[in-house]
Swiss-Prot record:
It comes from Deinococcus deserti (strain DSM 17065 / CIP 109153 / LMG 22923 / VCD115). Residues 18-37 bind DNA. Repressor specific for genes preceded by a radiation/desiccation response motif (RDRM) site, which is present upstream of several radiation-induced genes. Residues 7-61 form the HTH cro/C1-type domain. GO terms for cellular component: cytosol. One of its GO terms (molecular function) is DNA binding. The keyword Mitochondrion does not apply. This is HTH-type transcriptional regulator DdrOP3. InterPro entries: Bact_TransReg_Diox, Cro/C1-type_HTH, Lambda_DNA-bd_dom_sf. It comes from the Bacteria. Cleaved between Leu-106 and Arg-107 by the IrrE metalloprotease after exposure to radiation. Cleavage inactivates DdrOP3, leading to derepression of the target genes. Keywords: DNA-binding, Plasmid, Repressor, Stress response, Transcription, Transcription regulation. The record marks L106, R107 as: Cleavage.
Length: 129
């Protein structure tokens, strides 16, 4: 399932309209419509806001979403999503850190798993904080 399909499914299974979710998530109806049609990709803040609106975690929101290579259609790399969802490790990450980590790529390669992402976070935190 693509992220756009997952977003539509979450809304429809609750019997809600686009404007209901958009208002609660503080995004525009056209933007939510574009997300549900796969026309645009959400920011981390939007994913967090939508997850909160649905009463679930970002990890739960991404559950069942297909990943292409190491990136899902419009979301975070799988290993980074796993790190965010980890109750102990993910709690340390602020939205700024998540945005920073999500941009890490060198020659088309990214960290592979939760542990790789966490090690990079620790190294950057030690240097930058």
């Amino acid at each position: 399932m693509k992220l756009c399909e997952r977003l539509r499914e979450l809304r429809q299974e609750r019997g809600l309209r686009l404007k209901d979710i958009a208002g609660a998530a503080q995004i525009s109806v056209p933007y939510l419509s574009d997300l549900e049609r796969g026309r645009t990709n959400p920011s981390l803040e939007t994913l967090q806001s939508l997850a909160s609106t649905y009463g679930i975690t970002v990890h739960d929101l991404l559950e069942g979403v297909e990943f292409y290579g190491d990136q899902t259609a419009g979301a975070l790399p799988q290993g980074l999503a796993d790190l965010i969802a980890d109750p102990a490790l993910g709690a340390q990450l602020t939205p700024d850190w998540i945005r920073t980590l999500a941009r890490i790529e060198l020659r088309g390669k990214r960290p592979r798993d939760k542990q790789d992402w966490f090690e990079i976070y620790l190294h950057l935190k030690r240097i930058l904080d």
